[in-house]
Amino acid sequence: MIQQETWLQVADNSGIKKVMCIKVLGGSKKRYASVGDEIIVAVKDAQPAFGLKDSTGKKVHNKAVQRAVVVRTTKEIRRPDGSYIRFDDNACAIIDDKGNPKGTRIFGPVARELRDKKYAKIISLAPEVL
């Protein structure tokens, strides 16, 4: 469960390493995000030398605001068959306004629930889908 002020690892090669959630998208009353939910994040640790650029053409730096989708959470997720899955860390992938990932690789496993939320591109880039 991701909420405001939660720090997350970035699971792609966009050059951003750590981010902090500043807003959970999906309505004014939505407080928590789970796997597959979109969030607004503030960059806390970035390597601008990688060349990722924001919508204005400037290189991404600390304090930049980006959109992201949650790909892993430490809070377990219940599946329809009754099983649960959880991960060792909270992680997200940086996306653009259309929902496409900005990175070209995804590191670590991602949850199968992303397929139901229409993030097939992230699923195809991930090395393992659990």
UniProtKB/Swiss-Prot annotation:
Organism: Leptospira borgpetersenii serovar Hardjo-bovis (strain JB197)
GO aspect biological process, one term: translation
CDD domains in UniProt: Ribosomal_uL14
Name of this chain's protein: Large ribosomal subunit protein uL14
Database matches in PANTHER family: 50S/60S RIBOSOMAL PROTEIN L14/L23 (PTHR11761), LARGE RIBOSOMAL SUBUNIT PROTEIN UL14M (PTHR11761:SF3)
Family according to the record: Belongs to the universal ribosomal protein uL14 family.
GO molecular function: large ribosomal subunit rRNA binding; structural constituent of ribosome
One GO CC annotation: cytosolic large ribosomal subunit
UniProt keyword Repressor, yes or no: no
Cell wall biogenesis/degradation found in the keyword field: no
Gene designation: rplN
Subunit structure: Part of the 50S ribosomal subunit. Forms a cluster with proteins L3 and L19. In the 70S ribosome, L14 and L19 interact and together make contacts with the 16S rRNA in bridges B5 and B8.
Function description: Binds to 23S rRNA. Forms part of two intersubunit bridges in the 70S ribosome.
Keywords: Ribonucleoprotein, Ribosomal protein, RNA-binding, rRNA-binding
